[in-house]
Amino acid sequence: MARFPTSPAPNRLLRLFSSNKRSSSPTAALLTGDFQLIRHFSAGTAARVAKDEKEPWWKESMDKLRNIGISAHIDSGKTTLTERVLFYTGRIHEIHEVRGRDGVGAKMDSMDLEREKGITIQSAATYCTWKDYKVNIIDTPGHVDFTIEVERALRVLDGAILVLCSVGGVQSQSITVDRQMRRYEVPRVAFINKLDRMGADPWKVLNQARAKLRHHSAAVQVPIGLEENFQGLIDLIHVKAYFFHGSSGENVVAGDIPADMEGLVAEKRRELIETVSEVDDVLAEKFLNDEPVSASELEEAIRRATIAQTFVPVFMGSAFKNKGVQPLLDGVVSFLPSPNEVNNYALDQNNNEERVTLTGSPDGPLVALAFKLEEGRFGQLTYLRVYEGVIKKGDFIINVNTGKRIKVPRLVRMHSNDMEDIQEAHAGQIVAVFGIECASGDTFTDGSVKYTMTSMNVPEPVMSLAVQPVSKDSGGQFSKALNRFQKEDPTFRVGLDPESGQTIISGMGELHLDIYVERMRREYKVDATVGKPRVNFRETITQRAEFDYLHKKQSGGAGQYGRVTGYVEPLPPGSKEKFEFENMIVGQAIPSGFIPAIEKGFKEAANSGSLIGHPVENLRIVLTDGASHAVDSSELAFKMAAIYAFRLCYTAARPVILEPVMLVELKVPTEFQGTVAGDINKRKGIIVGNDQEGDDSVITANVPLNNMFGYSTSLRSMTQGKGEFTMEYKEHSAVSNEVQAQLVNAYSASKATE
């Protein structure tokens, strides 16, 4: 193995980097110090940490609290990184690997399925202490099928670590989770992982982050060696080299900067200062005046820019090889915000949903958001983020969404699937409550205010399966399992096919649904037969169409009479709502008491379009006139009038079928590029990108989901088992006339045989 010289840096290099004296700032103090052995955890240290964590957290300064998530593309090393974080902070005392080869598995992958498959399926919460800072951590899945876990984690977090693979670079799910971070305005640091891997190129990944993620970013470290020669890191802020010794990298030792790296270090530090100065006025003034920048000044500028989301500092390392994790932890507490540095808002339901800024003070009224539900051993486990006030065991709290008054029977802090009972939690905390019934997204207060938090983004399912229990005796457990899964996961839906009577489950992909079928078998002892996956098509209209329908039945006894007049039209592109109903009747042509029944009728009709029986979306219905009968009009009559009116005008609105289109990213050896690209074209895919990464080609394409079934097998065959791919939902778009005709004919044929 090649070794790098460690001769002392010459005086000219030190002068270039200005003063490196110990700073009085709290952030700078985290990384400076006149010591060689920076951190070594012993059993005594772990015991001290455990003792500290028993103290009520609300007494700690809010400045010393961090709520962070760890997100990335699948197999980038998120859970491995979290395992090291827990070890170095003394939260666990042994390191276990993700796939559980030792029979244990990573702490944060508590489900048997997670340990067997080597992937994270559910987000998991934990907490730890690092240099007097309390850190709540949520480890999230990387597979696109479990994207809701990322959504609800980021909804309640104040900061995040975006993990990037030094070989794979910025991949499709990297782009997705970064977009989610932007949606919830979450400041982040990046961690380029796996520097020990063959083909590691952190500078290429940094440039990809700038181009693909539009990050204004720069490295805060330089690696000493790469691949099998990766030995340590050079901190560009404090101009120090760090090496990671010990069987698990627990001893971080400061050393001299290798002489042959001095030029690169000077160049990269200047690049860091210049990049940050572009978004920070204080640093810009010093940079433009060519004044020396001290470590504390640079660190404070990075913190300001990171919290303002105008800069993303980039850390490096190898979690698996136990290198670079402790400096990353320093970066988390130095650069990511505390809860009181983040602007959180609620909607005042007593004041027309006016936005109210939450102070984040423990002394304010309680405001907490339920963001995740689980079925625990002792009943429903509800994860809460406390935004303001204090919640205590035994308190009575109000569910603002339902109006119910609930007692808090048990309050816990989670450590993956383990829990620690606590008496209270204050603003900024992430905790869990047992024994309260609620839905994901509900807001709780102490009753003194009527605030609700804005909801999280929940994507629509794109795939469905017909399922039924093998044994009729399992019907009760079958229903119980499906009800629980729906409560836990907003993207998992259960319905009944009105024609076949089959139970239909819908979700974000094949893996998503397979996991729930397997969980049903393991957790509820229900074996189920599963039909072929089917795509969740949609229908929509393309032009305005009028309707004028009279529903009349008067053949003795109570009659039915209701007339509705108006039009249907497509909603503008990009509308958030999928269905709109507007009553524009002037006067009392239809009594106002019947209007809700009319809206209900149109909604019911739109649940099943006449082309292929799938839901109709992007639809606006306007009611302009109508007529009623003093005796025979009823809610049922007007509901039926709306249903028939919709069916009659639907064809005139020129309906089309929409299909889910997936963003597919393939990585294949270049020798197979032509074959794979040709196959994508056969599947009616559109190639939108083609990059070269060493000996591999990375192809990006938009492909109809209906043409992607069985693709894993086909790709293995085409590439001799060397190709890999990921895909995520992009949009629903109109099918071609040819495909629409085929789908309509197939639907008509199936109806004819019933």
Curated annotation (Swiss-Prot):
It is found in: Mitochondrion. Pathway: Protein biosynthesis; polypeptide chain elongation. It comes from the Eukaryota. Keywords: Elongation factor, GTP-binding, Mitochondrion, Nucleotide-binding, Protein biosynthesis, Transit peptide. Residues 1-17 form a transit peptide. Gene3D superfamilies: 3.30.230.10, 3.30.70.240, Elongation Factor G (Translational Gtpase), domain 3, P-loop containing nucleotide triphosphate hydrolases, Translation factors. Residues 63-340 form the tr-type G domain. One of its GO terms (biological process) is mitochondrial translational elongation. Expressed in cotyledons and adult leaves at the same levels. One of its GO terms (cellular component) is mitochondrion. The keyword Repeat does not apply. InterPro entries: EFG_II, EFG_III, EFG_III/V, EFG_IV, EFG_V, EFG_V-like, EFTu-like_2, G_TR_CS. CDD domains: EF-G, EFG_III, EFG_mtEFG1_IV, mtEFG1_C, mtEFG1_II_like. GTP binds at residues 72-79, 139-143, 193-196. It holds the Pfam family EFG_III. SMART domains: EFG_C (SM00838), EFG_IV (SM00889). PROSITE patterns: G_TR_1 (PS00301), G_TR_2 (PS51722). GO terms for molecular function: ATP binding; GTP binding; GTPase activity; translation elongation factor activity. Its main location: mitochondrion. Mitochondrial GTPase that catalyzes the GTP-dependent ribosomal translocation step during translation elongation. During this step, the ribosome changes from the pre-translocational (PRE) to the post-translocational (POST) state as the newly formed A-site-bound peptidyl-tRNA and P-site-bound deacylated tRNA move to the P and E sites, respectively. Catalyzes the coordinated movement of the two tRNA molecules, the mRNA and conformational changes in the ribosome. Belongs to the TRAFAC class translation factor GTPase superfamily. Classic translation factor GTPase family. EF-G/EF-2 subfamily. This is Elongation factor G-1, mitochondrial. It comes from Arabidopsis thaliana (Mouse-ear cress).
